[in-house]
Each structure stands twice: as structure tokens, then as C-alpha cells.
A protein has these predicted regions:
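Compact beta-sheet-dominated domain cores in extracellular/mature segments
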Residues: 1-129
Length: 129
């Protein structure tokens, strides 16, 4: 018997405003995660402080919504951008942040180096975390 994982997109961001971002060891690397321990990602086609991930892209890669703050081990600059749909999205060193619907539990890093929705996705290493 073979089981297959099928990710179903959600229409609402899985992250909410006012959360603390943290550094977490995943696969021997210190990565940026949300307050629930889910790995955060950045999208190569985004430009500094501007997201191009909307529609079906945002369904698979929910933007980290609202304001965020830096928790222990987070050394970069946390900020926000205003998306073209009027919502606010958290950023790290100017990169808009996203979660990945394929990551269902803390410590997973399934979205790293995936070429999907028009570009390459990367996890966010945190120096010194």
C-alpha cells in the first residue's frame, strides 16, 4: 500500500499578525520559523519589499500576515510591506515571508529549493541562531 501526500491550498494565510519569529534548528541549520515552529520561506521572483505571489501562488505559499517581531536568535531586520491586495505581510531583511502548505508540523522544511508558482523558493537561514 502506497500513500501519497497531496497538498490542498488554503485561501487564508496560516500565520497571523503580531507573532514572534524565531530561529530553530532544522536539519542542522538555524532557520527562521513562525511562532508555531513552521519554516518560513522567501520567493526568488519577489523584489526587496515587494511580493509577486498572489492568487494560486498565495494559496500554496500563504504570506505571513501582519506585524511580527524578532525572537531569540533572530538577527535580521523584521519589517512589513503593504501587498497590492491591501493586506500587510511580514518581511525579513526586506524579503516578504511565506509558509508552505506542504509543511504540516514544526521542523519540516519541504518547501526549500522548490521551483513552483513561477520561481524558486528558499528557507531563511538565520546567522548566529
Amino acid at each position: 500500500l502506497t500513500a501519497a501526500f497531496v497538498a490542498t491550498p488554503k485561501t487564508q494565510p496560516v500565520a497571523s499578525g503580531g507573532q514572534m519569529l524565531q530561529a530553530r534548528q532544522i536539519g542542522g541549520v538555524s532557520l527562521l520559523t513562525n511562532a508555531k515552529g513552521l519554516t518560513l520561506y522567501w520567493f526568488a521572483p519577489d523584489s526587496p519589499n515587494k511580493s509577486v505571489c498572489y492568487g494560486s501562488c498565495a494559496a500554496y505559499w500563504p504570506p505571513v500576515a501582519g506585524n511580527a517581531s524578532a525572537g531569540p536568535g533572530v538577527t535580521g531586520t523584521i519589517g512589513t510591506i503593504k501587498r497590492t491586495d491591501g493586506t500587510t505581510q511580514a518581511t525579513y531583511d526586506g524579503h516578504p515571508l511565506y509558509t508552505y502548505i506542504g509543511d504540516s508540523a514544526p521542523g519540516q522544511d519541504g518547501g526549500n529549493n522548490i521551483n513552483l508558482n513561477g520561481g524558486l523558493w528558499h528557507d531563511v537561514p538565520v546567522a548566529g541562531g
